[in-house]
Swiss-Prot record:
It catalyses: (S)-malate + NAD(+) = oxaloacetate + NADH + H(+). NAD(+) binds at G9, A10, G11, F12, V13, G14, D33, N95, V118, N119, N120. GO terms for molecular function: L-lactate dehydrogenase activity; L-malate dehydrogenase (NAD+) activity. Keywords: NAD, Oxidoreductase, Tricarboxylic acid cycle. The active site is at H175. This is Malate dehydrogenase. Belongs to the LDH/MDH superfamily. MDH type 3 family. The gene is mdh. GO terms for biological process: lactate metabolic process; tricarboxylic acid cycle.
Length: 309
C-alpha cells in the first residue's frame, strides 16, 4: 500500500512541496486548502504532468479534512504573510488561529502521522501544533534548519568555487535573524571550510545566511521563497517515509539538551520513521553557546507572546 502525504495549504510553498514529493514518488498526495477550486486545480495540473515525468502517485485536491484521513505525514504550510502595519503580535495571533484550526481538524484523522510544520513563526507554531495535536513530541517537528543549512551550503559553494554536493554544514537555533550557523562544523568533502574561505568572508556568508529569507522577499517585492523551502520540506518527508536516519537540523522539542527545556528549537537530530529519533548534542564552545542562548531567548519571547494571547 502506498504512503499518504497530506499538505495543508495550497499556496506557493504547499503546491511546490507537492511537486517535489510527486517527483520523488514518495506516496499519494492530498493538497488541502480552504479556498474552493485552488487545491483541486493545482493538484489536477500536477497530476496531469505524471505521464510526462513518469511519477505513479495520485495527487488530489480538496477542501475537506476527511480526505486527509490516515496520512503518514502531514505538512502544514498554511499561514498569513506579514502585511504592512501589522505588528509581530498580530502576525503571531493570526497564524496561531490558523494553526489551531488546521491541527485540530487534521490530527485526529491521522493519529499515527508525523507532523511537519512550515509556517511562521516556526518554532512557536511547532510548539502550538504539538500542544493542539497531543501527539508525542518526537512526531511533531519544524522545518527551518534544512532550508537555512541549504542556503548556507549554497553560499559556501559559491564562494569556494566547489560543488554544492561536497559542502556539509550545520546550524542551530531559531529560524530567522537569531539562527546560529556553525562554521566549525562545516566542511567541504571533510576538509574544514576555513581551509577554503577567509574568516572575514565566512562571517559575511554567515550573515547572508541569517538574512536569506529576507533577501528573497526584497528581490521579489511581492511574496517570499518557495522552491528551496519546499525542497527542504520534501527532504524531511523522505527521511521519515523511507526511515533514512538522516542527520539534519530541525525544530525539535528539548527536554534539557543544551540546557534548554520546554521549547521547540533548531538542533541536529536523527530523523527517521518515528520522527525525531535522537537529538544530537554537539560540543559547543563558549562563543557558540552564547549565540545559542541568545537565539533561545528570542524564540522564548515569541513563545511567551503566543501563550499570552
Amino acid at each position: 500500500m502506498r504512503k499518504k502525504i497530506s499538505i495543508i495549504g495550497a499556496g506557493f510553498v504547499g503546491s511546490t512541496t507537492a511537486h517535489w514529493l510527486a517527483a520523488k514518488e514518495l506516496g499519494d498526495i492530498v493538497l488541502l486548502d480552504i479556498v474552493e477550486g485552488v487545491p483541486q486545480g493545482k493538484a489536477l495540473d500536477l497530476y496531469e504532468a505524471s505521464p510526462i515525468e513518469g511519477f505513479d502517485v495520485r495527487v488530489t485536491g480538496t477542501n475537506n479534512y476527511a480526505d486527509t484521513a490516515n496520512s503518514d505525514v502531514i505538512v502544514v504550510t498554511s499561514g498569513a504573510p506579514r502585511k504592512p502595519g501589522m505588528s509581530r503580535e498580530d502576525l503571531i495571533k493570526v497564524n496561531a488561529d490558523i494553526t489551531r484550526a488546521c491541527i485540530s481538524q487534521a490530527a485526529p484523522l491521522s493519529p499515527n502521522a508525523v507532523i511537519i510544520m512550515v509556517n511562521n513563526p516556526l518554532d512557536a507554531m511547532t510548539y502550538l501544533a504539538a500542544e493542539v495535536s497531543g501527539f508525542p513530541k518526537e512526531r511533531v517537528i519544524g522545518q527551518a534548519g534544512v532550508l537555512d543549512a541549504a542556503r548556507y551550503r549554497t553560499f559556501i559553494a559559491m564562494e569556494a568555487g566547489v560543488s554544492v554536493e561536497d559542502v556539509q554544514a550545520m546550524l542551530m537555533g531559531g529560524h530567522g535573524d537569531e539562527m546560529v550557523p556553525l562554521p566549525r562544523f562545516s566542511t567541504i568533502s571533510g576538509i574544514p571550510v576555513s581551509e577554503f574561505i577567509a574568516p572575514d568572508r565566512l562571517a559575511q556568508i554567515v550573515e547572508r545566511t541569517r538574512k536569506g529569507g529576507g533577501e528573497i522577499v526584497n528581490l521579489l517585492k511581492t511574496g517570499s521563497a518557495y522552491y528551496a523551502p519546499a525542497a527542504a520540506t520534501a527532504q524531511m518527508v523522505e527521511a521519515v517515509l523511507k526511515d533514512k536516519k538522516r542527520v539534519m537540523p530541525v525544530a525539535a522539542y528539548l527536554t534539557g539538551q543544551y540546557g534548554l527545556n520546554d521549547i521547540y528549537f533548531g538542533v541536529p537530530v536523527i530523523l527517521g520513521a518515528g520522527g525525531v529519533e535522537k537529538i544530537l548534542e554537539l560540543p559547543l564552545n563558549e562563543e557558540e553557546m552564547a549565540l545559542l542562548n541568545a537565539s533561545a531567548k528570542a524564540v522564548r519571547a515569541t513563545l511567551d507572546t503566543l501563550k499570552s494571547l
